[in-house]
Amino acid sequence: MNKTKKIGMYTLVLMIFTSVFGFTNIPRSFYLMGYGAIPWYIISGILFFIPYAFMMTEFGAAFKDEKGGIYSWMEKSVGSKFAFLGTFMWYTSNIIWMVSVASSIWVPASNFLFGSDKTKEWELLGLSGSKLLGILGIILIITITYISTKGLKNISKIASIGGIFVTIANILLLVGGIIVLVGNGFTPAEPINFHAFVSSPNKNYTSIIGMASFMVFALFSYGGLEVVSGLVDEAENPIKNFPKAIKLSAIIISVGYCIAILFVGFFTNWNSILTVGNVNMANVAYIVLNNLGTQIGNVLGFSQGNAVILGNFFARFIGLSMLLALTGAFFTVIYSPIKQLIEGTPNKIWPKSWTKINKNNMPTNAMWIQCAVVVIIIALSAFGGKSASKFLDYLILMGNVSMTIPYMFLSIAFIYFKKKEYINKPIKIFKSYKSGAIWGIIVTFIIGFANIFTIIQPIIEENDYFSTVLQVAGPILFVIIGLILYARYKKKNKLNNKEDDSLLSKI
């Protein structure tokens, strides 16, 4: 009966790849730092993503039969209060991600339909800019929620399609980069030298604080691995396939980012391409890929007109690829986090109707409540008077910090997990408690360090207090809400402090 519901290893790899690897992070990173982004990706990969992936591997193998995902991991490693706050914080960061993507996903849609970002020109029934994007985002979230309630089969299928197209997009970038490099006599468009790897052509990222704060963008590029943790019990042969899928994905993603950023420089001169016109974080990916098509046309001897046509085709294809990739990730994020929140945390925290599972084994009521929350946030943000560009930028900034703080909960929990010898650990990548604790501390420090720099950078460099407040307010608000919910649960069920974990019982 359950065989049809199980997820194979390669499907799981594609789901992880879709959830973690963001193709747009490649041109965005090159836009912010040039080749200087590569060392930060290497540092973040070595000190954060790879050890973090190994931690998730050990967690997943040890708790392969648990349905609660990261809540179960943290609850059994540290305690219920710590686990609830970490899970709730992580869940709310995914709400922010959904709000951001529900509006920003229309940029790749525009590139697919029109060959360039024309979202600022869109107008319908008197609505334009962030207002129109907000309305479209609301329609999208409702549609995806409806389809997702029909079962995991639909989710895994759409997520896999997204992963396939992201893979094709990366192959296109790599092969295209080689063609341009060879066609130009092995002379990269952006000169390669030692200085290029330790500095940034972007004046906003030339200071120590600016360069260090870029680390949070690298960390964000590696984010999302824990989303699939809720699918351990849905995996085919989880004790073997889940850890293998995580390790394989971690290697592909880490190496892939660094190579891809290098290849962007083969066909993109930073000063010539990324300083002309209205280049921003939302559209830079399509500008870069449009340029790739144009440069390929040039080295192959196309006429200027045909080279431009090829560039537009590349922009359209990347638009389609990113549209499908983001849609695939959306389907995973719209289900897995709410599943872990509802099935992992104590049922009595939530109203009884929220925990009901439909015939497709989906928490339908909770998913529609989640949909309503996202719709309300989108509406409030869209009609707040900000331009589309600022609207997207603020949401991206807000998501960076909110998304990475929960990683600290998991890395701290891993230290406790390694210490508890009675927990059966089928896979031990970190062979001893000491090595696990050291890497747990390193990962926690790296995340905290990057977030602090990101938070203070707007004040120090631009005197922009609003950006700082925005990045700090979200996480604080969600922690307060989490504490209130847990306190209500504890009071209602007359739990005493002895049942709380020692780490957070004093909060």
Task: List each language-model region with its residue ranges.
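Membrane-interface loop-to-helix entry segments
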Residues: G134-E190, G223, I246-I251, I396-F409, ...
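C-terminal membrane-solvent junction of multi-pass transporters and transport-like membrane proteins
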Residues: N2-K6, I357-N360, T404-I456
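Helix-loop-helix junctions that connect adjacent transmembrane segments
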Residues: I38-P39, E121-L125, G129-K131, S160-A307
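Transmembrane alpha-helical segments of multi-pass small-molecule transport proteins
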Residues: T11-I16, F114-L152, N170-G176, Q370-V373, ...
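Extracellular loop-to-transmembrane helix junctions
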Residues: N25-L133, V469-V479
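Membrane-interface "cap" regions at the ends of multi-pass membrane proteins
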Residues: M1-P39, I43, F49-T57, D65, ...
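Loop-to-transmembrane helix boundary motifs in multi-pass membrane proteins
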Residues: T4-L12, G134, E236-P238, L248-I253, ...
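TM-loop-TM module centered on a large, flexible mid-protein loop between adjacent transmembrane helices
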Residues: S72, I251-F330, P351-F391
